[in-house]
Every structure is written in structure tokens, then in C-alpha cells.
Amino acid sequence: MPTSSRSHRRAADISRRQLLAGASAGAAALFLERGGLHAQAPAGSTVVFSHTTVVNVDAVQNDVALAVEGDKIAAIGPTDQILQRYPRAEVYDGRGKALFPGLVNCHAHLAATLERGFNEDFGFPNSAKLSVRPGSLLQGEEATLMVTIGALEALRTGTTTIVENTGGIARSAAALAKTGLRCVFAESVRDSENVPGPMSPEGLTKSETPKFSAKLRDEGLQRIDELFSKWHGANQGRITVFPAAALAETASPELLKAVRAFAEKHDLGYTIHLSQSMAEVDFMVRHHGLRPPAFLDKHGFLGPRLFAAHCRYVNDADIALLGKSRTIVSHQAAMAANRGVIPPIPALRAAGCPIANGTDNNTNDLFEVMRVALLTERIRRDDPFPGVRPQPEDALEDATMGGARAVRQEKLVGSLEVGKKADLLVLDTQRAHLEPAGRIVSAWIHNGQASDIESSMVDGQFIMRNRKVLTMDEAGIIAEADRVGKRIWGQVEAAGPVAIPGRTRRR
């Protein structure tokens, strides 16, 4: 692991001549102290991360350099050789740092940031009996503000690619594009007139045979087409658009076929929420005579282009269908645990389902999700000798290459390889909770913090550098979100009593 003569040192530019001269550690430390912060590298320039550690799932290279030229990784190798190859490059001192692939968040609802600190404690679907929904009180551009602060959290915590899965993405698309994140806009549609979703136990008792509307279906498909026409491939290819059916319980066979057809026509992936509650499963059996995966299979929706969100309540037959079809599962480990559920990821993986991960609601910290995924899968496995499978490298793979496969960009992102996009994280390893460490991947996932991330790049451009976000007004966004949140929650409380669970145990 690379070392540094001073903890928490700000990265500074070092000339090629000084590095090649083999300056002593003391001289290097003095130079670093006198150096200033990096300026943002201009588009198309070359940046060399020197004397650093390059981390991939299957290999960790110590004391090497990684060169970024334009938007791609151009070279990885010994620092002196890389600097000789790129004599005009800007040099980012990598001593005491490790480069990780950027994380790929395959399932997010960024606007739900509004309800964090409340939504997490009422089960799923939310059982709180509020007189008014907080989201209905947003005014003007405030919904976009909630999306933006969610994206800000995602950026700070290591995400470089994010799938925003909701309806009406056009309203916040421009703001998301400006964050610098690689985005997949999964425009979500439904065509049921009389099925509220997601299904709840209360909704199930009142449910009736679904009625589907061609008008709703056509409007939703038009939204997908318009979003695709305007945004797919925008911002030098950073933005892609996928179609999405919202929920199994709100989708007709015709909608499912149309979503898949759109994806196949344009060589895209597509997504849906699947088997996320027992109420959903019971609804589908009651009104369609099939469990959710079987319903999707009957209508040709399963397959390797599909990444299904959740799959918490699946039985052996469901798992067999998903595995046989090579459907990808994005399981949102932290939110599942929050709901008191551990999805059967070992069985899904064994059946043939590629696995990815996401954040879902309220929180957008995929780094924390990696750790929860590792620990909850160890519990779910119930191995005779526990605590060995999965390994931290498995959790990292699901959050990087697993996500890249789900969004059909595995040839572009998900690992640090020559020719791939320069989507990467710079981790400061000189931290009390990371040193000493036998394995950097294990140390970070078990003991690390998102704040260990010093800088991040997307498309070869820094979107955060030396812990300063470069693409958004962080302080302004936080202050405005605080103001709006206080107003809205004040209105919620004024509209009627809010039953807060509070402490559930008494002596």
C-alpha cells in the first residue's frame, strides 16, 4: 500500500523533473506543503496519478501510475515510464492514495430525499398515516432541488454512474446532467387505472381486477420516446435513457411488451420493481393467477436486458425463472435491511442472475450499501463456517462491474483498465481507520467511510477534487434544501397529527 509522509495532505502538482530526480521523502513532503491545490484540468488534457495504488476487483497494483488522457484511461504502469510517456501531463501525487473504479448505483429515486429521517421507520409501503404527502407540498423547482441534493450526496459518497428511476424525469434532467455524473434516465410508466402502487396490505384488501388504459400507456411511451430523443447520448454520451415499467402490479401485458420492444429497438436495458413486498405477490396471484416473475415471464419481459429491482420475496420457482432468463437483479441491500428483509442473493446468483446494487429511497450512499450487502449476504447464506463468503471484492464487483453490466456499459466503466472511461475515485488511505491494512479493498469496505474519498472523476474530468465538489454549489444547495424541508415538514405537522414511533422498548 502506498504511504505518505503526512496524513490528510492536500494533493499538489509535482513536476516530472522532481519526481524523476528521486527526491527524498522529506524534500517531497516540503514540496507538498508549499504546493497549492490542483486547478481543474481542462477538457482533453492529460492527468497522471503518480506513485499510487490502482484497485480492481481481481488485482491491486501498488506503486504505479495511471494516466488519463481526455476521457479515457490511457496507461497504467511504473511511474517513471508513464511520466516519460506524458511529459506535459499534470501530475496528481498519489502517495498515500488508492484509485478505485467509480460506483454504479442501479436504482435510485432521488426526489425521495425529501422524506429521509421519516420514511425509513414505517415499513414498506410506508404505514404512516399522514394527512398530506410531503411531496405534494413541493413548489416550483423544489422537486428538482431534492433531486439535486440527492445527486450531491451520491457524488460525495463515490457514485459516478446513477440510474434515476421515476416518471417525469424531463423536469430534472438538465439539473442532473449538470452534476457531472454519468446518468441513466429510466423513465417509469404504468397503464393501470385502478391499482395504486406500490401495493400495500390495505390496498390488497380493497383491490379489484386491474383495468388498463391505452391512453395512459400511450402517454407513458411518448414520455419515454421524447426523453430518449432529447437526452440519449447527450453530454458526450454521459446521459443514456432506458424505458421502465413502474411495477408488476400496474403494468399490462401490452405495456410490458412495448417497453421491451423499445429497449430492443434501440439496444438498451430496461427495468421494473419486482417482488418487493408480499402484498405485491398476493395481488398478482389473486388477480393474474401468477406470481410476479411468472407473470413477467409469460409476457416475455424477463431476460438479460432487464435489471429487476429488489426481488425480496421470491421462491424457488421464481428464482429458477429469473436465473434461466439471465435477468439481472439489483437488490438495494441497505433499503432491504431497513425493511427487515434480506433478499436471497446467494440463491439468485447460483441460479444464474447477475447481481447489481442500488440505494433506492432517502439515502444515496452506495458505499454504505456495499458494506450492508456484504454483511447481510453472509447472514443469509447461513454457511456452516460463517463469515467467509462473500468477500469484500464480491461486494465491490456488484457495485462496479455488476452495475456496469446492468446499464450495458461494461466495456466503458466498472473497472480501471486502459481504454475504458476515466470514471474513478481517489481514496485517501492515510486515515486512522484504514492504516495499517493487509488488503485495501477489505479495509475500505469493512472499516472505511465515504469521506475517505478525496477526489472523483467522470469522463476524465474531476467532479470533486480535494473534497470540494466542482459541479454544484454545495453550500447553497444544502441551505436551500434545509429551508424547504423545514417548511414542508412544518406544513405536514400542521395538517394533522404525525404519529412518531419513538422508543419501542420500555424498562
Short names for language-model regions:
Residues P2-V64, V68-K72, T79, R85, ...:
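Active-site microenvironment of metallo-dependent hydrolases
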Residues T52, L66, D71, G96, ...:
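Divalent metal-coordination and catalytic microenvironments
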Residues L114-L145, L152, E187-K215, M278-R305, ...:
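Active-site gating loops and adjacent loop-to-helix segments of metal-dependent hydrolytic enzymes
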Residues R116-L181, G220-Q236, D482-V484:
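Alpha-helical scaffold segments that flank or form the walls of functional sites
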Residues A174-R312:
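Metal-coordinating catalytic core of metallo-dependent amide/deamination hydrolases
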Residues G180-R182, E264-D267, F301-P304, L321-S330, ...:
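Glycine-enriched alpha-helix->loop->beta-strand junction motifs that scaffold or abut catalytic
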